[in-house]
Amino acid sequence: MTWGRSGRVAHSDWRRLASEEDRREYDAFGPWIYEIKAEGDTPKRFRAACASHHDARFLLKAPRNVERRDVRPGMDLYVAVLAVHDDGLSLMRLTDERVVSQDVVWSEVAALESYKDLLYSRWTLMLRDGGAFVFEYNTVSAGLMGKATDFVRSRWIRHDEAPSARQANSVVTVADRYFSNALAAQRRHGPQPVEPIHFEPAGRYCRDAANRFAISTGVMFLDAPDELIIVNRDKPTRRFFEAVDAVSCIFVPYAGLTSFALARPPTCRAPRFHQLRLSVDKQVVEQSCLVEPAGVLARLAAYGVPQTA
């Protein structure tokens, strides 16, 4: 009987027959994003598209979302390459056996969102025309993407004088372990100093958008000299026994804001949410707040952002 023998030979052949370059790429393959530092690091499918991007500040290749046991040397192991330059970025995707590129300059960007939910992460540039530029990756690469995030944020620093500082009685205390850690992370890694200007702890009884009883997940607004930072848990409420693992950080440069509005909720026994709308041309960033975010409204007014009804 030779069934097992023929299977073993076939299993070993795919590695022996692969080129050294394909074996090297296969051996390094995993769920993480790699920084491309030499032409040999560039996936074959992307080499023509990447030819003009080797001077990028960040040149990152994202793997396919596939089990390692299902891939072999020579397969297309990478689905996207992100090139971040001083004046903008390019996202190259492999679709239908060809590479499609999307280019963005910083003046087209309205806001940036960094989203994580366990092992799934998403990096989104919200564009002024209402569109979005999305790059998905595994959370194991959060450190590298955090560096890319800080670089993008540094592109909208204006280097002029910010509005006058907040009064001493406007200091906001963040009394929540999760949000305290998020604040510490922003202070440690961000390109500019930040201060909390509005904070709502998680765990408050409230009503959700459908007027059902729920528990709030909390929100924190941070003020930096050139940007407003919103830290939330993706959705404003959870069910009573629901676990929430997601976190979203949204970075909105003050200079790009064209208007803001606050929709107040009807009065009822259980609190309902205010809806803060930040507009950057056709792009809108919305955030639910159980309490009127007076500190945020004051900062927006100080920057001269017009309020609409």
Say what each PLM segment does.
Residues M1-V79, D86, D117-D226, V231-A309:
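Intrinsic disorder/low-complexity detector
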Residues K61-R69, H85-S107:
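Short N-terminal edge-element motif at the start of the domain
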